[in-house]
Amino acid sequence: MFCIGGVNMKRSFFLYSNGTLKRKDNTITFINEKDEKRDIPIEMVDDFYVMSEMNFNTKFINYISQFGIPIHFFNYYTFYTGSFYPREMNISGQLLVKQVEHYTNEQKRVEIAREFIEGASFNIYRNLRYYNGRGKDLKLYMDQIEELRKHLKEVNNVEELMGYEGNIRKIYYEAWNIIVNQEIDFEKRVKNPPDNMINSLISFVNTLFYTKVLGEIYKTQLNPTVSYLHQPSTRRFSLSLDISEVFKPLIVDRLIFSLLNKNQITEKSFVKDFEYLRLKEDVSKLIVQEFEDRLKQIITHKDLNRKISYQYLVRLECYKLIKHLLGEKKYKSFQMWW
């Protein structure tokens, strides 16, 4: 019925069974097709992930909106279809003006976009260095990426930055064939639709992470539709894509490498449906649990000198960006230090 992520008081609830979500007094009730019921205390819920057919009414929506709880929807093929987000509770007109100002000013936009790429490419390099030190010969890929990174400071437009980012990722993805112990024949990233096991796996875990980043943005005063590296769009929360780039090597890629190298995911984990590769339900649940466990992993922050989770690192990144936008402190993207 449920797959519950996380170990803290507030949790993500992944709903794999068809059914109904409804408000019952001051709690949430899930009723499946067999009329089995489970009550979910509202204070336990961070967000809902609907991986099935689900019914709910405006009474339920109004109730979860009071608590700022989003719902993320996935289709039969485990493709993300969208999110319901309550009305923003943390609003700052001053910050919104500054966000837009830093987008419309090309120099200010490039400065932020470049820093996203600096962080992402550094963390990619650290991943390669990590596996190079564990018996994988990745020196050639490391040298190529290091050479490309040297030119980032010279770039003065977003399109060229995206070009460098694409070239760095192309080299990085070529190295996956060495990092992963299975025969994966991974040549390039294909998204719409993903055409093989690796692309399907990347798409699913990326999407899980995008929604988590969006949730962290929502807890701050940032507007998730105003972005700097990715072009803002009428149909996506593009700032979550920007911030995700910095953390994907640590959270998404490391998780995928672990799942594949432990043979928790193989070609048998997928079902072919027409031109799509669909994750089996039990495999999807496994990935969700491993993903949530990774987000809850604790490290000691080098500057704060206190223990925080990987997920909270994302919130800190939002706060750092806010300080930059308000002119308090120049934004420096997250870079792995361990």
From Swiss-Prot:
Cofactor(s) this protein requires: Mg(2+); Mn(2+)
UniProt KW keywords: Antiviral defense, DNA-binding, Endonuclease, Hydrolase, Magnesium, Manganese, Metal-binding, Nuclease
GO biological process, one term: defense response to virus
InterPro entries per record: CRISPR-assoc_Cas1 (IPR002729), CRISPR-assoc_Cas1_C (IPR042206), CRISPR-assoc_Cas1_HMARI/TNEAP (IPR019858), CRISPR-assoc_Cas1_N (IPR042211)
Source taxon at top rank: Bacteria
Protein residues bound to Mn(2+): E165, H230, E245
EC number(s) on file: 3.1.-.-
GO MF entries: DNA binding; DNA endonuclease activity; metal ion binding
Enzyme kind, highest EC tier: hydrolase
Subunit text: Homodimer, forms a heterotetramer with a Cas2 homodimer.
Matching PANTHER family: CRISPR-ASSOCIATED ENDONUCLEASE CAS1
Annotated family: Belongs to the CRISPR-associated endonuclease Cas1 family.
Function, in words: CRISPR (clustered regularly interspaced short palindromic repeat), is an adaptive immune system that provides protection against mobile genetic elements (viruses, transposable elements and conjugative plasmids). CRISPR clusters contain spacers, sequences complementary to antecedent mobile elements, and target invading nucleic acids. CRISPR clusters are transcribed and processed into CRISPR RNA (crRNA). Acts as a dsDNA endonuclease. Involved in the integration of spacer DNA into the CRISPR cassette.
Protein name: CRISPR-associated endonuclease Cas1
